[in-house]
A protein has these predicted regions:
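Trafficking entry modules
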Residues: 110, 114-121
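Helix-rich interaction surfaces within compact, conserved domain-sized segments
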Residues: 103, 121-129
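Positively charged, polar, low-complexity stretches
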Residues: 2, 6, 10-106, 117, ...
Length: 149
C-alpha cells in the first residue's frame, strides 16, 4: 500500500503459535535465506541473549548468524538481536518480540508479530493489531495452528 509516495510497512501476524521463540527462529532463517536482514526486537537484555543463543543453536543442523547492533560485524550480519532500538542499522524486516508495538516500526519495510497461545500474549497482540489497523496498515494473518495446516 502507498501513502503519499511512501510504501507502508507490510505487517504479518503469525498466530496460534505453540513456541514463540522457535517460530521466531524459523521466520528469521526463512528471511535470511531470501537475502533479507532481520532486526529482532526483544523485551530486555536477558530475552535478547536467550534469542541469540537459540539462533546459534537451532535448527539442529544449521545456525543463523546474529549479533548485537554495536558488534563490528553488524553491518554484514543477517540478524541483529536488540532490546534498545536506538541504533537501527537497516530497514528490511523487524521481528517484534515485545508485548508493545515498536515506536519505530514504520521505518521498516516489513513487521512480523508472533502470537502464542498464552491468553495474556493474545490480549497484548490484539492491542497491537488494533493499533496498526486503526492507522491504516493492511495486516496479513497467518494461522499456524495444527487445524489450519
Amino acid at each position: 500500500m502507498r501513502l503519499r509516495g511512501w510504501l507502508l510497512t507490510q505487517i504479518d501476524f503469525y498466530f496460534h503459535v505453540e513456541n514463540k521463540l522457535r517460530t521466531a527462529c524459523a521466520l528469521s532463517a526463512k528471511a535470511s535465506a531470501r537475502g533479507l536482514r532481520v532486526w529482532a526486537f526483544c523485551a530486555d537484555a536477558d530475552a535478547s541473549q536467550k534469542f541469540s543463543r537459540m539462533l546459534w543453536t537451532a535448527p539442529a543442523l544449521s545456525f543463523i548468524p546474529n549479533c548485537k547492533p554495536d558488534d563490528r560485524l553488524a553491518a554484514v550480519t543477517p540478524v541483529i538481536v536488540d532490546y534498545e532500538g536506538t541504533r537501527l542499522l537497516h530497514d528490511q524486516v523487524l521481528l517484534n518480540l515485545r508485548t508493545e508495538w515498536p515506536p519505530f516500526f514504520s521505518r521498516f519495510q516489513r513487521l512480523i508479530e508472533i502470537v502464542s497461545l498464552d491468553e495474556e500474549d493474545r490480549c497484548r497482540a490484539r492491542e497491537r493489531y488494533k493499533f496498526y489497523r486503526d492507522r491504516g496498515y493492511e495486516i496479513q494473518n497467518h494461522d499456524l495452528s495444527e487445524s489450519a495446516q
